[in-house]
Amino acid sequence: MGVPIGELLPKKELELENLNGRKVAIDAFNAIYQFLSTIRQKDGTPLMDSKGRITSHLSGLFYRTINLMEAGIKPAYVFDGKPPEFKKKELEKRAETREEALEKWEIALARGELEEAKKYAQRASKINEILIEDAKKLLELMGIPWVQAPSEGEAQAAYMASKGDVWASASQDYDSLLFGTPKLVRNLTITGKRKLPGKDVYIEVKPELILLEDVLKELKLTREKLIELAILVGTDYNPGGIKGLGPKKALEIVKYSKDPLSKYQKTSEVDLYAIKEFFLNPPTTNDYKLEWKLPDEESIIKFLCDEHDFSEERVKNGLERLKKVTKTGKQFTLDTWFKK
């Protein structure tokens, strides 16, 4: 879900090519969820192989990653670990929402209402361990590094960006800024023409760059105050925030209150100060290596085509594109591709 503070934040529109030569840590769960939600058949059914195993995430990961690399981007994917205890309520709520959407999807299918069915099917998307392991395996075969976060993937990606190991972190959620990423790229894995939900209208989605320094300067806040603002309007750890407080009103409160959380802690079901501390000092790890390698073409064909029934012609075309990028790069050589 993330934090609903987007309307307050200064953003810069980018072209993918503006990120040429940049290393970017991508929130893997965020990207995979997008692939599961958008890469579906007309009735909302996800792509599946002959054994009924979902493959939408593999299709998205394979072809979208190649697109990023053709633009000169060096992607690394960061996977979630164990969520904090106070995220339990939000995860339970999401599970309920998925179950409700699944029921509505089945009803819409029975009625032959394909547009409605697809809408509910997207909301029913769910990530499980099998999908995660498949995604990691594909990335390894493609020569793309992935990192296992001890807790939140966004926090780990932000840590990597703050260390300078990557140029930016990428996610749809603004939480990355709360975790301290100096640069956040949004829309990285959904760039292109996208259909608006429930409408026969398409829009052009472009990447956005948000700089933490610009955000703090624009809002006249410290990062600590930005976190307090987010808690007041609601985060994944206290969904909905404080009743009656929107972003603009919450901004005024945090600006002029030394301890804005104290007033609301008394009636909160969760420890607001624990949430603040988690954003300031989340669990992270240095146990990772960002090494980009040549793809294992034979194993990719075996994994995608033999095991999961992908079109061999399409996969081979993708591999040709991938091979071309890793051999010549876009405006950089093989030496700079492998350079950390």
Swiss-Prot record:
Biological process terms from the Gene Ontology for this record are: DNA repair; DNA replication, removal of RNA primer
Record-listed E.C. numbers:
3.1.-.-
Quick one: where's region Interaction with PCNA? 330-338
Q: Where is this region: I-domain?
A: 116-258
State the top-level EC class: hydrolase
| SUPFAM superfamilies membership | 5' to 3' exonuclease, C-terminal subdomain, PIN domain-like
The residues the record assigns to binding Mg(2+) 1 are: 27, 80, 152, 154
Give the domain of life: Archaea
A Pfam family annotated for this chain is: XPG_I
Q: Where is this region: N-domain?
A: 1-98
Q: Name one GO molecular function term.
A: 5'-3' exonuclease activity
Q: Does the keyword DNA repair apply?
A: yes
The cofactor note from the UniProt entry for this protein is:
Binds 2 magnesium ions per subunit. They probably participate in the reaction catalyzed by the enzyme. May bind an additional third magnesium ion after substrate binding.
Keyword list (alphabetical) reads: DNA damage, DNA repair, DNA replication, Endonuclease, Exonuclease, Hydrolase, Magnesium, Metal-binding, Nuclease
* UniProt record similarity statement: Belongs to the XPG/RAD2 endonuclease family. FEN1 subfamily.
Q: Which HAMAP family match?
A: Fen
| Free-text function comment from the UniProt entry | Structure-specific nuclease with 5'-flap endonuclease and 5'-3' exonuclease activities involved in DNA replication and repair. During DNA replication, cleaves the 5'-overhanging flap structure that is generated by displacement synthesis when DNA polymerase encounters the 5'-end of a downstream Okazaki fragment. Binds the unpaired 3'-DNA end and kinks the DNA to facilitate 5' cleavage specificity. Cleaves one nucleotide into the double-stranded DNA from the junction in flap DNA, leaving a nick for ligation. Also involved in the base excision repair (BER) pathway.
PANTHER family for the chain: FLAP ENDONUCLEASE 1 (PTHR11081:SF9), FLAP ENDONUCLEASE FAMILY MEMBER (PTHR11081)
- Quaternary organization: Interacts with PCNA. PCNA stimulates the nuclease activity without altering cleavage specificity.
| Protein known as | Flap endonuclease 1
Which species is this record about? Thermococcus sibiricus (strain DSM 12597 / MM 739)
